[in-house]
C-alpha cells in the first residue's frame, strides 16, 4: 500500500483524501477516455462483471447513495444478498476503518455531504487498495458505486503535461494538504522525488513544486 510509504495518518480523512485524489482523478480521466466515453455499459451483479461495449471487467460493489434519505450505505451491509466475492473491496474498507479508527469506512451508514460521498469514498478506496477505477450507476432513488480494474488504463506512462493538468484541477477543486497531495500523486505514479522543507523535486520531467510554511503550493517550475 503506497500510503505506508507516504506516512500519512490513516485515521485522518483529510490526509487520506489529499494523498489519494490525484491518482484517482488521473485514473478516472483515463478510464473515461479509453473505456467509458461513447460506450454502452452493462452491469451483472450475479457474475460480478461490468461491460463497456462488450469489454468485460471484474467488478466489486462499493456501496450506494440514497437520494431520499441523503445517506451512504456501505456494500458490506449486503442488504441485497450479493455473493461475498462482490464485497471483498468493501470488506477491506471496513477492516481498514476499524483498524485505524476511520469512521467513514467502519460506519455502515451515514449522511452525505461535500466531503463524505460516493465519489470521495471511492477515490480513496480505489487508490489505496489496488488502484482501481470506479463507476457510478444512477437508478431511481439513488446511485450505486462499483470498482473495476483495467490494465489498459496503466499501459501508457504518466506524462508531464498530464501530471500538471491533474495538479491544477485538483487544487482548484478540493481543499487539500498540497504537500501530501503532490507526494501522493508522484509516489502512486511511481515517480521518484526528493524533498526539502519547502520544495519537492521530481527526478522525472525536472518538475519543482514549492510550498509556503502552511504546505500550500505557491509555485511550479517546469522545463516543458
Give, region by region, the residue ranges found by the protein language model.
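Short amphipathic beta-strand/extended segments with alternating polar/hydrophobic composition
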Residues: 54-64, 147-148, 207-212
Amino acid at each position: 500500500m503506497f500510503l505506508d510509504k507516504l506516512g500519512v495518518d490513516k485515521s485522518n480523512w483529510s490526509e487520506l483524501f489529499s494523498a489519494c485524489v490525484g491518482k484517482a482523478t488521473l485514473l478516472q480521466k483515463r478510464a473515461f477516455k479509453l473505456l467509458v466515453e461513447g460506450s454502452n455499459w452493462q452491469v451483472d451483479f450475479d457474475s460480478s462483471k461490468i461491460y463497456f461495449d462488450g469489454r468485460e471487467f471484474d467488478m466489486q460493489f462499493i456501496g450506494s447513495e440514497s437520494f431520499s434519505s441523503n445517506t451512504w450505505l456501505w456494500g458490506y451491509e449486503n442488504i441485497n444478498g450479493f455473493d461475498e466475492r462482490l464485497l471483498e473491496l468493501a470488506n477491506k474498507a471496513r477492516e481498514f476503518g476499524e483498524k485505524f479508527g476511520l469512521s467513514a469506512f467502519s460506519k455502515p451508514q451515514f449522511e452525505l455531504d461535500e466531503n463524505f460521498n460516493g465519489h470521495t469514498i471511492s477515490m480513496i478506496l480505489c487508490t489505496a487498495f489496488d488502484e482501481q477505477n470506479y463507476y457510478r450507476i444512477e437508478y431511481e432513488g439513488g446511485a450505486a458505486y462499483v470498482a473495476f480494474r483495467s490494465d489498459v488504463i496503466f499501459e501508457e506512462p504518466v506524462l508531464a503535461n498530464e501530471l500538471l493538468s491533474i495538479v491544477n484541477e485538483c487544487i482548484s477543486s478540493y481543499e487539500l494538504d498540497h504537500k501530501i497531495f503532490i507526494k501522493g500523486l508522484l509516489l502512486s505514479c511511481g515517480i521518484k522525488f526528493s524533498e526539502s522543507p519547502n520544495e519537492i523535486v521530481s527526478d522525472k520531467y525536472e518538475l519543482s513544486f514549492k510550498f509556503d510554511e502552511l504546505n500550500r503550493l505557491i509555485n511550479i517550475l517546469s522545463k516543458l
